[in-house]
Amino acid sequence: MITRFAPSPTGLIHLGNARTALIAYFAARSSGGEFILRIDDTDVTRIKSEYVNKIFTDLSWLGIKEDLCIKQSERCELYANAVVKLKESGRIYPCYETPEELEIERRSLLARALPPVYRRKNRPQHSTRLPYYRFELDPDRVVIWEDKLRGKIVIDLHSTSDPIVIRENGTYTYMLPSVVDDIECRISTIIRGEDHISNTAVQIQMFEALGCTEIPKFAHMPLLKLQTGKMSKRAGGNEIQTFRENYIEPEVICLYLLNLGSKSRSTFKNYKDYSNFNLENYSSSSSVTVLEDEIYSLNADFLRLSNYEDLARRLGGVSKTFWDAVKNNVKSIPEVNYWWEICTTEAKLYPGIGCNAQLVRDAISVLPQEEVSRETYRRWVELIVENYRYDKREVHINLRLALTGKVGGPEMAAILPFISRERILIRLNDSLS
């Protein structure tokens, strides 16, 4: 199987793009095939070079390694050859209408209760205007294909306009170059969102017009949506870059997206085993909702299940004993580093805010003489409760505030052994000043 992922560098890759890339990548690898990355950069008015670089960064971060990378901007000669062939066969024709004239025609058709469809007619040449070009569809032919996820799909193109393939400025639209590249790269399976179903019907006619005898198989995935609505580059907030900057692990994004909408459930241990992957396990339901809270929760699970040795390089000087003490109560690696700094250095705290000063004084009066361990911390809390009649929860909250400057975090009994008794006493007194 040869698959491809074809992002357009007009924005950052979001979760929906990444899911398509991952599924196409795993489909290729599970079959022993090839995965091709194609940069769709023909629309010079919208693309930005910075987004090209970020596509590579995001895919590399996700562990996606292409077998071949092509850029459409470097393949225009191939497209020009295809255009010559289609002109010779009469399937591409010039048009001269301005956008304003097309809008007038559209309104006229609607006013007569007719579909606003652009078809080839005896359209006059225009001596002073540059032409743009359309591909002539066969409107009387119903396009049928067997989708790998949705089964039989039937599209009637009677109400579809002939698509524009070359703009007035000579640049290509998405439709034709995509087909030319799929033929030239021998793509066997095209995996993409369900919003491309109508494009597929049009492109099947393009494949045929170019003499392609082995048209790729298609798998149209349900679109991802957020709880707040549709996912898109324009809406933002769900980009891979954003999750990376928020310290979500790449394994978490991969596992979450690969499991989303699938009948089978992979784990961190086995999701990279390509032999477990089956494209047909994915649902063809109309949409799949992304719950960002689940991603952050899954990140915490990943850290909890990770071995110290696997993360040691990224943990800096954090000791294994500290990692084991806090890993069940943190959601990101920077959070581990943060708590390590609080516990082992003279970190700048603001512990006095919100503390019960009398409780802190009472806590100082019964602070054990030995270095604090899990057991001595529990005994210390019990002494404060028994001697001064405080609620145990209140004691925990105030000790946490005084000693860490925070209202939440890892279990106090787990982290206090990493704060020396001397530092504990200093912080308790500082919280009173």
UniProtKB/Swiss-Prot annotation:
A motif ('HIGH' region) lies at residues 7-17. It comes from the Bacteria. GO terms for cellular component: cytoplasm. Its main location: cytoplasm. Pfam families: tRNA-synt_1c (PF00749). It catalyses: tRNA(Glu) + L-glutamate + ATP = L-glutamyl-tRNA(Glu) + AMP + diphosphate. Catalyzes the attachment of glutamate to tRNA(Glu) in a two-step reaction: glutamate is first activated by ATP to form Glu-AMP and then transferred to the acceptor end of tRNA(Glu). This is Glutamate--tRNA ligase 1. It comes from Neorickettsia sennetsu (strain ATCC VR-367 / Miyayama) (Ehrlichia sennetsu). The gene is gltX1.
